[in-house]
Amino acid sequence: IVKGEAGSPYAIRNYFDVSPALANNHDNRMAEFEALIRRTHKAGMKVIIDFVPNHVFRQYDTYFTKENFYLLEGPLVLPESLGSDYVENPAKATGNDVFHTSPSINDWYDTVKLNYDNRDTWFKMLEVLKFWAAKGVDGFRCDMVEMVPAEFFGWAISEIKYIYPNTFFIAEVYGKKNYRRYHEIGGFDLLYDKSGFYDTLRSIICDGASTRLLTGEWQFLGDLQPRMLNFLENHDEQRIASDFFAGSGRAAFPALAVSLLFNKASFMLYFGQEFGERGMEQEGFSTLDGRTSIFDYCTVPSIRRWLLDRLTVEELVVYKEYSRLLKIATSDAIFAHGETFDLMYTNPDSERFNGNRQFAFMRGYEDACMLVVANFDGRPAEIEINIPSEAYSFFGINKAGERVRLKVGANDYTRLNLV
């Protein structure tokens, strides 16, 4: 039972193998993966892979027993539109927590949920982590962690770090009410900032929500800020350059600047995003939905053009800006290590500041200070920013407050050295 031609990569059929579809030589696939790890390390980078602890392929029966699943009363009844003659009796609960025998076409009917009420499941999943860590994998992006007990992760992560202390764990956690739980109990190093920062940025771009909402999301995080992982795209979400989101790669620039420069959160880049990949192809199971399909064998147009050295002029512009901003965020000490002062509360709406479409903040480190203003409006703006003396005092700088005038392009951002 698969979705699309390739099937979901999150419907795990063997936790201890590499998909033959990813190998040049199917019979040599594990050796190829190990060589990839060595090449990556030689290049000074780390290898992070997905760990999918909540659900597996419905017909995965070589590692688990029936006690590792949730068994229901009665046979599985698949959606009629699938035309499947697959028989499963008793049915198992689906990966998205459907605890009845008739999942819908929108459910994860191709997966079954693992039973963490059974302690045996904990030990089996720990062995999966040990297997890949022993091969030199540096970290794990853990899928759908809120569907798995935080206590399991707290135990498993501590067990792995006892053997491999530098192993890194990222939590795909969506509900911001659970952020602290999966850091403090789950032991994760980084947490997706989905329902906070990402959802707010998307609402600003798509729904006209006020940029002032970003202040509340920032304040909500408190001491968790360095533990957050900002992103504008991932395999579940629509491409930011798609017609369903910002509409172009350039229109993403203010959100990119805020995601990279506002606080100390890390940032995740999804492949092709740096070229303004639009995800507007009809790709089988996924249909035309602004996403790059994970269910079918398909070409990502911008990636193909990049490999052939044929990027369009627009893609080169977007790529240059992503490269520049990523370099600033990681190599400029103000943004890599500095503190943040939010200027929104000192700047009420006026003729020269639209607090619903513009966002202003300062970053400071040692004796340097920088102003950043992002303009989410489709029109250029001449902006005046009020910087109070308290902002400079916050950074340990003795300087009077001032008003600064600057110009910001449509759907763009600007930076200004203040000290």
Over which residues does each language-model region extend?
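Substrate-binding/active-site clefts of carbohydrate-active enzymes
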Residues: I1-F131, A156, I160-Y162, Y179
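Conserved, mostly hydrophobic/aromatic
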Residues: Y15, T40, D50, W132, ...
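Active-site groove signature of glycoside hydrolases
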Residues: V52-H55, K124-A150, N230, N234
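Loop/helix patches that line or flank the sugar-binding groove of alpha-linked glycan CAZymes
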Residues: L213, Q225, F231-N234, R239-R403
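Glycan-recognition surfaces
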Residues: P75, V98-F99, S158, Y162-F245, ...
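C-terminal beta-strand-rich structural cap/linker in extracellular carbohydrate-active enzymes
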Residues: K407-V419
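The substrate-binding groove and active-site-proximal loops of carbohydrate-active enzymes
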Residues: P9-M30, R58, D107-W122, V137-M147, ...
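Short, solvent-exposed turn/loop segments enriched in Gly/Ser/Thr/Pro and often Arg
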Residues: I1-E5, D50-Y60, D143-P149, E172-K176, ...
